């Protein structure tokens, strides 16, 4: 290899960890923003939960409110940074398929969260029973 190529590769290897940190920080920032929008007072979110309840009355607004409140509190910068600390952010992102369950409100969100925080690209198939809220979340992200 010539000197220029070697120097470029060395430079890339030195910057790669910084690039990964920046990318992961952007994902965390987007998730923190989502957490601020996950409130029972959010009209778009209310519309999505109401529409879901019309199609599947097992997923009540009260159960959604519990789940939304939980995720809103969980999606803080500090919590997310602690969560990802022991796990590497990938150098080679892959497409990861996620087929989401729909028996509990937002049960598939944890899977989406893990895929995004690891640096991969999520290809999701929301549950037909819980699709409107998940589609809202994906739209926000």
Where are these regions (language model features)?
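Conserved small-residue-rich beta-alpha loop and adjacent elements
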Residues: 80-141
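N-terminal Rossmann-like NAD(P)+-binding subdomain of aldehyde/semialdehyde dehydrogenases
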Residues: 1-95
């Amino acid at each position: 290899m010539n000197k220029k190529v070697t120097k470029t590769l060395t430079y890339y290897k030195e910057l790669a960890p910084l690039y990964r940190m920046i990318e992961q920080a952007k994902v965390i920032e987007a998730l923190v923003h989502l957490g601020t929008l996950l409130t029972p007072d959010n009209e778009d979110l209310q519309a999505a939960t109401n529409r879901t309840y019309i199609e599947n009355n097992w997923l009540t607004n009260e159960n959604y409110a519990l789940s939304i409140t939980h995720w809103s509190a969980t999606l803080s910068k500090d919590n997310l940074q602690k969560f990802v600390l022991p796990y590497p952010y990938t150098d080679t992102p892959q497409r990861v398929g996620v087929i989401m369950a729909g028996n509990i409100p937002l049960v598939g969100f944890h899977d989406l969260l893990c895929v995004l925080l690891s640096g991969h690209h999520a290809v999701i198939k929301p549950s037909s029973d819980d699709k409107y809220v998940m589609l809202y979340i994906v739209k926000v992200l």
